[in-house]
């Protein structure tokens, strides 16, 4: 076996593997032997079927298996010898072995760019001193109250107001004709939370339960739905219900429902929770300063496939949001051309990938590794947060290949932790 390894770019390589006719024949015969071992055919004893008969019967399967298995072995051997770690699936030519003929196959793959690392030890970074105020504790307790609040129907004869949860049917009309897709039944929103256009909320506030109202809703010129941008649409609405939140009292019963002995213990736990979160945020901000400072000192190419995959994912998420059919929602997302969307997605992708690539390359330099149990622990925590069955969640991650992205993420985290631990962290007052 001979091979030629070429660099197409700083992040892309091409590998050409060549085999002699004898090596091809040996590989084919090895697979034929596997097939004939337990094969029984009329006129032949088990395991004694001639090679030519076996190959004739299973030629396609044998050829494919011999080619794939042999290439897999040689590729692994070459990668180990050349210390290569490909980033993504290998793109190989669709060729198979032919008996008594030489064989050549070319594959391309991407690798991390070579980075000349600046000094990353002993860097000084400022980190905010963490303090938790009584006001912040009170705000957290208020949020817990809201989470445990009971929604009840408003009994008095009144129109809805900010803070109320309303259930509305609506239809949009332009010049007396219904506007396509601008309609909905039992649209639920909390007034005053910018969950809908201001004109729509104001129209809802003019109605009482069971009443129908008509009014004009003006859509911003930069509204995400281009067919509605800048238009004034006649809306017919019907208010189905008004609900308001009844907050529980901050007393011993409330504390016990939240899982604590008394209200003082709940306040203490809330303060600890805030301290932990603030410390995590302060550390995260310090880490961002460190990595951004290091990235300013280096230039490197981002692997093309990695970049395009990330851009496609960002654009896909944008399309999902754009296709959600609540046409009365606020028009804060701007209408953008495809080119603008792509360019913005590229900027967003690079902001994520450049730190990740730098840290992955540093992890390789420092010989950092991610253990299997670390991956399993991360998957378990993710499943818990997503409220999904762990085994199903884990299987889905492995089947989709997302587990490899998770491994890269964990490796980058380890490298970032290394930089932070080697840094001179100076705590400063906010």
Swiss-Prot record:
Which GO annotations describe the biological process of this protein?
Answer: 'de novo' cotranslational protein folding; cell division; chaperone-mediated protein folding; protein transport; protein unfolding
Reaction(s) catalysed by this chain, per the record, are: [protein]-peptidylproline (omega=180) = [protein]-peptidylproline (omega=0)
What superkingdom does the record give? Answer: Bacteria
InterPro entries assigned: PPIase_dom_sf, PPIase_FKBP_dom, Trig_fac, Trigger_fac_C, Trigger_fac_C_sf, Trigger_fac_ribosome-bd_bac, Trigger_fac_ribosome-bd_sf, Trigger_fact/SurA_dom_sf
* PANTHER family the UniProt entry points to: TRIGGER FACTOR CHAPERONE AND PEPTIDYL-PROLYL CIS/TRANS ISOMERASE, TRIGGER FACTOR-LIKE PROTEIN TIG, CHLOROPLASTIC
* Role played: Involved in protein export. Acts as a chaperone by maintaining the newly synthesized protein in an open conformation. Functions as a peptidyl-prolyl cis-trans isomerase.
Q: Which family does it belong to?
A: Belongs to the FKBP-type PPIase family. Tig subfamily.
Name of the featured protein = Trigger factor
């Amino acid at each position: 076996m001979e091979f030629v390894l070429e660099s197409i770019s700083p992040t892309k390589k091409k590998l050409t593997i060549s085999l002699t006719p004898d090596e091809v024949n040996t590989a084919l015969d090895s697979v034929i032997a596997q097939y004939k071992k337990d094969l029984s055919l009329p006129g032949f004893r088990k395991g004694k079927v001639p090679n030519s008969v076996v190959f004739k019967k299973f030629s396609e399967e044998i050829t494919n298996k011999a080619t794939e298995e042999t290439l897999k072995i040689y590729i692994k051997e070459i990668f180990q010898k050349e210390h290569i770690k490909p980033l993504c699936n290998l793109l190989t030519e669709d060729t198979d072995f032919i008996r008594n003929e030489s064989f050549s196959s070319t594959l391309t793959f991407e690798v991390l760019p070579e980075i000349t690392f600046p000094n990353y030890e002993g860097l000084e970074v400022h980190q905010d001193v963490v303090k938790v105020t009584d006001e912040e504790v009170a705000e957290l307790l208020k949020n817990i109250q809201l989470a445990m609040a009971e929604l009840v129907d408003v009994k008095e004869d009144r129109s809805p107001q900010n803070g109320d949860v309303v259930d509305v049917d609506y239809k949009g009309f332009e010049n007396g004709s219904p506007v396509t897709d601008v309609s909905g039944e039992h649209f639920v929103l909390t007034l005053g939370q910018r969950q809908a256009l201001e004109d729509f909320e104001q129209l809802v506030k003019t109605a009482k339960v069971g009443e129908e109202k008509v009014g004009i809703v003006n859509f911003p010129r930069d509204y995400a739905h281009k067919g509605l941008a800048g238009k004034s649409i006649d809306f017919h609405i019907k208010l189905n219900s008004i609900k308001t939140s009844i907050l529980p009292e901050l007393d011993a019963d409330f504390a016990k429902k939240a899982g604590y002995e008394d209200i003082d213990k709940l306040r203490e736990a809330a303060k600890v929770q805030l301290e932990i979160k603030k410390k995590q945020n302060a550390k995260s901000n310090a880490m961002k300063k460190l990595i951004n400072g290091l990235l300013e000192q280096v230039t490197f190419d981002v692997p093309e496939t990695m970049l395009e995959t990330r851009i496609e994912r960002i654009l896909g998420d944008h399309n999902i949001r754009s296709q959600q059919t609540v046409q009365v929602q606020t028009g804060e997302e701007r209408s953008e051309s495809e080119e603008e969307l792509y360019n913005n997605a590229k900027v967003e992708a690079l902001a994520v990938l450049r730190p990740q690539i730098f840290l992955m390359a540093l992890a390789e330099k420092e010989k950092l590794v991610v253990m299997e149990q670390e991956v399993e622990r991360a998957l378990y925590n993710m499943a818990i947060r997503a409220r999904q069955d762990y085994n199903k969640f884990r299987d889905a991650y492995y089947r989709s290949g997302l587990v490899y992205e998770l491994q890269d993420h964990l490796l980058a985290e380890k490298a970032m932790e290394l930089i932070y631990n080697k840094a001179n962290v100076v705590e400063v007052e906010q």
